Amino acid sequence: MTACSSPPRGLIILCAGDSLTDSEYPRHLHRLLAREGRRTRVLNGGRKGNTSGEFWRYLKQRGPALAREHPDFVLLQLGTNDVRVDGDHTPADTFANNMRKIIGLFREFTDRRGERARILLATIPPLPERYSFPFGPESAGRVVREINPLIQKIAAEEQLVLVDNYGLFLRSPELLPDVHPSSAGYRLLARNWYDALKPLLPDIEVRPGK
């Protein structure tokens, strides 16, 4: 896990997920928040290649250490690796169960005031028309038919803020040339998270003169 900044006060945001999180977007998100004068620490908790099950196993081990960071917000996006066609293929019901366990553990996290961390849950981007192993045409179909509907259902059941990263890249497919976005795509992804976060941010911790 890496931090984009480490101010003594301000917001703490934990970005959790797979390689789409272990990427450029947390750094871009920090810049967007800093631009408006916020003291913010953005923690990159992305795990390259992780399915929901692998991330759950990681979280069971690393959860206590992450909890000690006392994040105000957790930004969660998982599911892309669950639609692989190799041994990482995850059945829909298993994916849903994994996500509920992950969210349940994150619900135990508290910020420095002792209040529960706010969790934002994102749909996963579409898979492009060019498939490369370990993804295939059936992977793209599962994103649409299974994974994202389950994410939407879980967000509603758990009363979480839902962030539409699927629709984001559906409208800008040129920024998603492969499974991973381009550099411009990661900036767009950070902006989408920022737009979802902004209404939830307190009117505090703004640097004097801003």
Model-inferred region functions:
Residues 32-35, 57-209:
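Alpha-helical cap/lid subdomain in secreted, periplasmic
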